[in-house]
Amino acid sequence: MIVVNKEDCIRCGACQGTCPTAAIEVTPEDVIYCDICGGEPKCVDACPTGALKIEDLVVDEAGNTQGRIVFNPDKCNECGDCVEVCPPQILKLDEGKVKKIPLQGFCVMCQKCVDICPVGVIGVEGIKEPAKVELEIEGPIFIADCVGCGMCVPECPVDAITLEKVGGVIEIDEDTCIKCGVCAQTCPWNAVYISGKKPEKRAKEIRKFELDEEACIGCNTCVEACPGDFIVPKSSNLTVELPAICTACGLCEQLCPVDAIDLDVELGPAKPASEEGLVWDEGKCDFIGACANICPNDAIRVVTREGMKLPDNEKVDEEPSFAMCTRCGACTMACPKGALSLVDMDKVIDGEVVKRKRVQYNPALCDQCGDCIEACPYDMLKLTDEKVPLKGFCILCDQCIPACPKGALSLK
């Protein structure tokens, strides 16, 4: 069966793009895949018509075998029993669609995911162990094996990152950096580590990834530049083949000498990265939104499981999410008038009085230029028509903590 080292996975999604049966799904939080239930697939047992069965497949020259799931669509009555019992919930019926194969999500042991993984974290049990990344992260800012794609540079809210040359190595100004972690969450190759942590990845959608074959001259610059070897040369017509899904770092597009590659990537919002003051525990959050509704300054935004964006009470077609002001200070550095500042306030934590940062706003100094809104890495700030024209910054009032029924918010 397929095994995945999720901890070191860079969430590029190349495995998902190459899987012929949609048996692997990659999200910023997890990698969900068919592991054939350890050799005893529940879907096979549940199928009342015998449309699903397991058989052994020889996978190497030594004659070692692995189980694979075989699906016969002629026997399938689309009852959905297999979908109901699937532990990782990867099996799906394409109901209402005219398809020769109505069921997706079962592993046929083709090993295409193993072959395409750019960091080798997908393996086959007993045959090939998934790679493990051994890193000694040193200091609050740590850069390892940067490919020089520059994807993080425009995302930095305080312009602390520079890249002298595409394909080189980024530099981060430690005096300017506010440790918000947006660069680490954005980096498609897990090359940046802030505050000693492995980053949670941002959601990412490849809206366009196209090759102009008439413009392409077959120089293979993109093939040689791609850190993941995703691009395949086509010598027969002097072009290349782009992957269905990859890290979308953009090196190929930037280095193409004839501008034959067009890549458009939409990044999802950054996740709150804070270890002091108000801290969010993603594992406990149930995306109810009580915290967002009670916050007096709209410094928390929640999309509930029912698709309501709070506190705006707006129905949206989005996955459940949580965002908040982390008091990172990006807005205070961007404000040209000094209307925003980070100030210390006393807080009692575990019986001890400690200093914690809050955002302080002086509306008399604000000219409503919007520079702070542009700088906010979490897209929290907004201008209003009220007496206090700016909202979205955390004043550390703590009202959200008791409002959360799951205990997902706390002071640290």
From Swiss-Prot:
Q: Which Gene3D superfamilies match?
A: 3.30.70.20
Q: Where are the transmembrane segments?
A: none
Q: Which UniProt keywords apply?
A: 4Fe-4S, Electron transport, Iron, Iron-sulfur, Metal-binding, Repeat, Transport
The residue range of the signal peptide is: none
Domain 4Fe-4S ferredoxin-type intervals: 1-29, 30-57, 67-96, 97-127, 138-166, 168-197, 207-236, 238-266, 276-305, 314-345, 357-386, 385-412
Cofactor(s) essential for the protein: [4Fe-4S] cluster
Give the cofactor note.
Answer: Binds 12 [4Fe-4S] clusters.
Q: Where does [4Fe-4S] cluster bind?
A: 9, 12, 15, 19, 76, 79, 82, 86, 107, 110, 113, 117, 146, 149, 152, 156, 177, 180, 183, 187, 216, 219, 222, 226, 246, 249, 252, 256, 325, 328, 331, 335, 366, 369, 372, 376, 394, 397, 400, 404
Q: SUPFAM superfamilies from the entry? A: 4Fe-4S ferredoxins
What PROSITE patterns does this protein's entry cite?
A: 4FE4S_FER_1, 4FE4S_FER_2
- Which Pfam families does this entry report, sorted A to Z? Fer4, Fer4_3, Fer4_7
Q: Which GO terms describe its molecular function?
A: 4 iron, 4 sulfur cluster binding; electron transfer activity; iron ion binding; oxidoreductase activity
Q: Which domain of life is it from?
A: Archaea
Name of the featured protein:
Polyferredoxin protein MvhB
According to its UniProt entry, this protein's organism is: Methanothermobacter marburgensis (strain ATCC BAA-927 / DSM 2133 / JCM 14651 / NBRC 100331 / OCM 82 / Marburg) (Methanobacterium thermoautotrophicum)
Q: What is the lineage of its organism?
A: Archaea, Methanobacteriati, Methanobacteriota, Methanomada group, Methanobacteria
